Amino acid sequence: MSQVKIGQFKFGQDTFTLRYVLGGEQQVKFVAKDIASNLKHANCAEAVRKHVDGKYKSTFEHGEIRSHLASNALAKQGDPLYLHPHTVLVTKEGVIQLIMKSKLPYAVELQAWLLEEVIPQVLCTGKYDPAIKHQQEETKRMTDRLIKVFTDHTTTLHAALVKKEKFVEFVVESNNKQIEAKNKLIEAKDQHVTRVMTDLNRMYSSFQDTMQRKDDIMKRKDEIIQKKDEQFQETMQKKDEQFKETIQKKDEQFKETIQKKDEQFQEIIQKKDAQLQETIQRKDEQIARLIDAAMDLSSRAVQYPADERKHPVLCVARDGTTFHGIAGQRRYVQSQKRKLGVKDDDLVLETRRPNPALDWTNATHTTSAVKRSKRSITFDSPEEAQLFEDTIKYLLSVDSVHK
């Protein structure tokens, strides 16, 4: 049964420590990580994945050596002879691919040494020993020593000498057979390497053809892109011209719209001015009539009672835009002020008048109030309310009494 082995492989001044497994059909597989590490690959896993074809590598669990997992289980994890089931193994072809992709200056010599010396010896002996090639010389020297000893003891050891001679002949014959087998194996390996190199040359030629086709495709792609760019430039130029025309039309339409709006605004302003002039004219006429009425009243001679509490009084109070008028004798006016809660700050005027009720009627009947009653009037704006207050103060200022 094949087992995981580890060996020291000396090449020149360098010594490689490699783990390997002998499989069926005279095939040896090396641990891929050991090979890549000794070949100075920076990333061993990446180098194996990238440079070694799938048919030249397998895992320790799923490869041809699956039946040897039981023997591997005897080695504990951490032992150099222990291999994880997912450990990647490579054949000699995979080793050649890793050597070809390495940057070592002696990669060619290393490949020849591996194919011609290491792998054949491992296949024949199960291990690699640099001294095995001197075995014949050592055997010959041992034979010479034995012959000398046998010569000295010919009488007593003749039978043993005959056996030793037969043994030597057997050893020599075995060595010759091994050498012949090695030569045949090397010849077969050379033929295989030749086929591999032929395949590689064919693959390289195919790669060159593929790269040439790729260059042609890229050239056609560049031409298409250039045409697309020219078409895009033409389209963008047309779009710019259309956009400028649209902007110009919109600008003209906007100017026409602004001109129309200005004309409409001028018409509205003129109408508003005319309405305002009419309103002012009506107000002026109302004020003139009020002034005439007041002047007429002021020209009359009035005689008031001796008791001031019986004097006729007109009181006007303001609450926002609403005015309240209280007309009657002073005693009545005072009681109504208290009843309505009129404060001094709310008074517009409080004046003695010959006929306060008539004065209030004359002052309010021509105004454009929103809401009116017998003794109150409401305006829709503070400006109109203030105009009414100023007018009534002016009209009824004669004999006014403010309290």
Curated annotation (Swiss-Prot):
Residues 3-126 form the Bro-N domain. Pfam families: Bro-N (PF02498). This is Uncharacterized Bro-N domain-containing protein J. It comes from Lymantria dispar multicapsid nuclear polyhedrosis virus (LdMNPV).
